[in-house]
Every structure is written in structure tokens, then in C-alpha cells.
């Protein structure tokens, strides 16, 4: 126990088989349906990016070097993280992008991450740069991936679960 585990899940683990995608490769049995798929809350048992540790980390308020981003530019994020546990530990800072106006695309997408070692009781400021292309989204009018103008959320935290994430806004030109 001298080292604290720091691995993160590369997939989500569902709570129930009802959360898995439906496949129609087999004929139906003809029995009455008794699945609870519709009544489930949709939250996985363990979300993508989740991990265990023997210590605890607190994410501070993000500082972004600009509120608006144009082609060819990059935005720099500064995120303070404090190890509030009793042991030295490693945390993986995860950065997700969410396009507010998109009702058909993904809820959020992982665009950056950084592994940091933080001694117990210490705060470390993590610096992550996102280039303009990190804000690419599918454009159905051109059938291409490209940065689409509008307001985006930068979500940051230690897993993909919304309650584990904090957010800041940025305008893409």
C-alpha cells in the first residue's frame, strides 16, 4: 500500500442489462416483454473515466486565457487540483467539450486528459492547451467534422459523470 492506484476505466459499466444496446439478430420468443429499460435512470454503474484511489482530490475553479477562439488559435486552461487526502496520489484530469446548440450529436466528447502526481496536502495547477480543432463537431450541411460557430462548454473533472464535472463557457468563432 505505499502507492495509490490511479487507473481509469476506458469504458462505462452498465448497472443492468437493460442499459445495453438492443440487437435484433435473434427472433423474438413471443413471450410478454418484461424489461425495465424504459424505467431506468440511464446512469451507468461505473462511468467512462472512473477510477479508485486511496486519496481524494478537489478540483478548483478553472482559469481560461480567452473567452473566444478563432481559427488557428488555441486556448490554455489552468486548473488547480488539491490532494485533500492522507497520501500522495495520481489524478487524471479529463477535459470534455459540449456543444450547447447540438441536440443530435454526443452529449460531450473527451478532447484532452493529463495525468498528474500530487503530494498529500499540496495543490498543483494543471495546464492543458486545446487547439481550435479540438472544437470540431459534425456538420450535417457539409458532412464533415469542423469547428462550428457558437457557445461550447468546457467540462473538466475526474470522470465522465456529470456530477464529477465542473464547467466553463467559450465562444467559437
Describe each model-derived feature in a short phrase.
Residues 102-140:
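Intrinsically disordered, low-complexity Pro/Gly/Ser/Thr-rich segments with frequent PxxP/GP/PP motifs
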Residues 58, 63, 80, 112-119, ...:
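Generic structural detector for well-ordered beta-strands
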Residues 131-173:
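Terminal connector regions
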Residues 74-76, 123-127, 165-167:
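Intrinsic-disorder/low-complexity, polar/charged segments enriched in Ser/Thr/Lys/Arg/Asp/Glu/Gln
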Residues 1-90, 96, 149, 153-157, ...:
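Secreted, periplasmic, or luminal enzymes acting at the cell surface/secretory milieu
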Residues 86-103, 108-110:
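Short acidic, flexible loop segments centered on an aromatic residue
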